[in-house]
């Protein structure tokens, strides 16, 4: 995982603390939020699997170090320190799918000052995005408790990763399946789908498009 997935000020603060000899101080960070999304009354926690992968693989490779060196704002000794950076602390979190409220700690981070600073941006990115999707999914499930709900967010996601992990978050929120084939394979999510307008446009008559689809996929109800 690219160690540059962070904000510049996290690195400059860590650089300055390193120069002062304060970079290995033990700290505890609590992560919480101030306002529920969608003007709602709760939030659904999601993102912990993604977060775990992010933390376990967060490191700086040679290209990362060379880029940071080119910025000419970091001490050489700090860049040497980053070459071997690995998270060695502990993270405690509320289970995924839990209903939480503003001001409650969702995650508690035990580590060094440097670890907390370098990882904070990525942790926030992951939990903010996936908890948002899970919360929306739960709100939809609440008003449609007996309906089959399918997640089709890939084509409007803000990038590949958002589409992949967003599909998983929707399942945490209560959806039944996803159109995202990669998410189905990776996370064991049921893959679902209908058909696109391009299929209908491939036929002279609309009814023929529907009949042919039913003929080829016998699990569909033919009427």
Task: Give short role names for the model-derived ranges.
Residues 222-223:
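Conserved small/polar residues in nucleotide/adenosyl-binding loops
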């Amino acid at each position: 995982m690219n160690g540059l997935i962070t904000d510049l000020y996290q690195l400059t603060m860590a650089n300055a603390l390193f120069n002062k000899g304060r970079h290995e101080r033990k700290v505890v960070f609590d992560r919480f939020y101030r306002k529920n999304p969608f003007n709602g009354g709760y939030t659904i926690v999601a993102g912990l699997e993604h977060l775990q992968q992010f933390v376990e693989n967060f490191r700086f490779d040679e290209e990362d170090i060379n880029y940071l060196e080119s910025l000419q704002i970091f001490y050489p000794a700090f860049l040497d320190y980053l070459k071997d950076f690995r998270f060695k602390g502990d993270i405690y979190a509320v289970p995924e799918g839990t209903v939480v409220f503003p001001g409650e700690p969702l995650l508690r981070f035990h580590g060094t000052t440097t670890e907390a600073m370098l990882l904070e941006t990525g942790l926030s990115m992951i939990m903010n995005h996936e908890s948002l999707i899970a919360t929306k999914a739960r709100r939809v499930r609440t008003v449609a408790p007996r309906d089959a709900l399918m997640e089709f967010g890939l084509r409007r996601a803000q990038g590949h990763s958002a589409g992949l992990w967003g599909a998983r978050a929707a399942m945490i929120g209560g959806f039944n399946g996803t159109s995202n084939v990669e998410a189905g394979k990776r996370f064991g999510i049921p893959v679902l789908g209908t058909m696109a307008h391009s299929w209908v446009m491939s036929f002279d008559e609309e009814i023929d498009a529907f009949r042919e689809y039913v003929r080829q996929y016998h699990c569909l109800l033919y009427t």
